[in-house]
UniProtKB/Swiss-Prot annotation:
One of its GO terms (molecular function) is 4 iron, 4 sulfur cluster binding. Residues 283-298 have a biased composition (Basic and acidic residues). It catalyses: [[Fe-S] cluster scaffold protein carrying a second [4Fe-4S](2+) cluster] + N(6)-octanoyl-L-lysyl-[protein] + 2 oxidized [2Fe-2S]-[ferredoxin] + 2 S-adenosyl-L-methionine + 4 H(+) = [[Fe-S] cluster scaffold protein] + N(6)-[(R)-dihydrolipoyl]-L-lysyl-[protein] + 4 Fe(3+) + 2 hydrogen sulfide + 2 5'-deoxyadenosine + 2 L-methionine + 2 reduced [2Fe-2S]-[ferredoxin]. Its cofactor is [4Fe-4S] cluster. It comes from Staphylococcus aureus (strain bovine RF122 / ET3-1). [4Fe-4S] cluster 2 binds at C68, C72, C75. This is Lipoyl synthase. Keywords: 4Fe-4S, Cytoplasm, Iron, Iron-sulfur, Metal-binding, S-adenosyl-L-methionine, Transferase. Binds 2 [4Fe-4S] clusters per subunit. One cluster is coordinated with 3 cysteines and an exchangeable S-adenosyl-L-methionine. InterPro entries: Aldolase_TIM, Elp3/MiaA/NifB-like_rSAM, LIAS_N, Lipoyl_synth, rSAM. Its EC number is 2.8.1.8. Residues 54-270 form the Radical SAM core domain. It holds the Pfam family LIAS_N. Belongs to the radical SAM superfamily. Lipoyl synthase family.
Length: 305
């Protein structure tokens, strides 16, 4: 039983979601099982899975296995000793994207600190295979910090994704508690170097709120991201995946998220999604640059012809 100091906050009404289990959703779920693929949508218990899979024709594949070498205190993904790399995974991901006619695909990965290249070669090959089979699908990558291995980052950026997404997750003060194996400054450097390697590829990051940060700390984090040339920001409510994870300290209202979005845009971000259910990949198909949007339009025209 929780003590007064550990009391669990009641989830507000605005966090209730409408389930959408149409053909897109059920078809994609069957495809993932058939191809033996993982999605962060399922593994991380994302609240938007029904909207993205069911209505938007977008999905987030999680590659390099389903077991992460880290144990961040906010994350529902399994941790432990990972399996051997599956070298056929890039082709299976590419086939699945093609079969589902996905408009936008996000490719994320568990952290593989056990691998010399942090998994970057298989990751880059996945991007290339998806691009070969799906020239009109926009591709976003969401890697770990790869242990600060910038040769691995260079390998990954050479695959030319449409967006590089790497999440700061929380404010500087809370980072050691929330994700002990990462550092705030390494995340900023990873984002800065990504832009230096491929200046025309938009960079993106995400902040979870509700972990005990102050508004001033959120604004400081926005400033740090802009100082490292980050283009796109998403801000969402932290939700506790299980009793083992960090507790929610505050539920922000939709009005508060609206204010955060306005501040972010005033600070110079090109795009900001902010809301209680917003996650890193939420409405990601809208956040690509104009060149990538033209690819999406060509794909839609082909699909409807």
């Amino acid at each position: 039983m929780a003590t007064k100091n550990e009391e669990i906050l009641r989830k507000p009404d605005w966090l209730k979601i409408k389930l959408n289990t149409n053909e897109n959703y059920t078809g994609l779920k069957k495809m993932m099982r058939k191809k033996n693929l993982n999605t962060v949508c399922e593994e991380a218990k994302c609240p938007n899975i029904h909207e993205c899979w069911g209505a938007r024709r977008t999905a987030t594949f999680m590659i390099l296995g389903a077991v992460c070498t880290r144990a961040c205190r906010f994350c529902a993904v399994k941790t432990g000793l990972p399996n051997e790399l599956d070298l056929n995974e890039p082709e299976r991901v590419a086939e699945s994207v093609e079969l589902m006619n996905l408009k936008h695909v996000v490719i994320t990965a568990v952290a593989r600190d056990d691998l010399r290249d942090a998994g970057s070669n298989v990751y880059a090959e996945t991007v290339r295979k998806v691009r070969e089979r799906n020239p009109f699908t926009t591709i976003e990558i969401l890697p770990s910090d790869m242990g600060g291995d910038y040769d691995a980052l260079e390998t990954l950026m050479a695959s030319r994704p449409d967006i590089l997404n790497h999440n700061i997750e929380t404010v500087r003060r809370l980072t050691p508690r929330v994700r002990a194996r990462a550092t705030y400054d390494r995340t900023l450097e990873f984002l800065r170097r990504s832009k230096e390697l491929q200046p025309d590829i938009p960079t993106k990051s995400s902040i979870m709120v509700g972990l005990g940060e102050t508004i001033e700390e959120i604004y400081e984090t926005m400033d740090d991201l802009r100082a490292n040339d980050v283009d796109i920001l998403t801000i969402g409510q932290y939700l506790q995946p299980s009793r083992k994870h960090l507790k929610v300290q505050k539920y922000y209202t939709p009005l508060e998220f609206g204010k955060l979005r306005k501040v972010a845009m005033d600070k110079g971000f090109k795009h900001c999604q902010a809301g209680p259910l917003v996650r890193s990949s939420y409405h990601a198909d809208e956040q690509v640059n104009e060149a990538a949007k033209e690819k999406q339009r060509q794909g839609e025209a082909q699909l409807n012809s």
